[in-house]
Curated annotation (Swiss-Prot):
This protein's name: Small ribosomal subunit protein uS15
Pfam families: Ribosomal_S15 (PF00312)
Keywords: Ribonucleoprotein, Ribosomal protein, RNA-binding, rRNA-binding
Annotated function: One of the primary rRNA binding proteins, it binds directly to 16S rRNA where it helps nucleate assembly of the platform of the 30S subunit by binding and bridging several RNA helices of the 16S rRNA. Forms an intersubunit bridge (bridge B4) with the 23S rRNA of the 50S subunit in the ribosome.
PROSITE patterns: RIBOSOMAL_S15
A biological process from GO: translation
GO molecular function (one): rRNA binding
Self-association state and partner proteins as the record states: Part of the 30S ribosomal subunit. Forms a bridge to the 50S subunit in the 70S ribosome, contacting the 23S rRNA.
Length: 89
């Protein structure tokens, strides 16, 4: 369940710290959050799709590690990101 280029570009534009920013933790977490939301909706319909469920858990773990990194580096950026994404951490 990959995102199309337009969806990624929209997310990058919203969460980028500078022009052309594709690799900052904020952008990565935002893209992962969108993919997680899409996979969650898929799994509501296809309850027995265990391969996608494993992929979802891997994405959640990757997002958690990135959020831990941001939290250790700059707590204010972390709090801002959590608030903007609407996450419960």
């Amino acid at each position: 369940m990959a995102l199309d280029q337009q969806a990624k570009a929209k997310i990058r534009a919203e969460y980028a710290t500078v022009e052309g920013d594709t690799g900052s933790p904020e952008v990565q977490v935002a893209v992962l959050t969108k993919r997680i939301a899409d996979l969650t909706e898929h799994l509501k319909v296809h309850k027995h799709d265990h391969h996608s469920r494993r992929g979802l858990l891997l994405l959640v773990g990757r997002r958690r590690r990135l959020l831990n990194y941001v939290q250790k580096r700059d707590i204010n950026r972390y709090r801002s990101l959590i608030e903007r994404l609407g996450l419960r951490r």
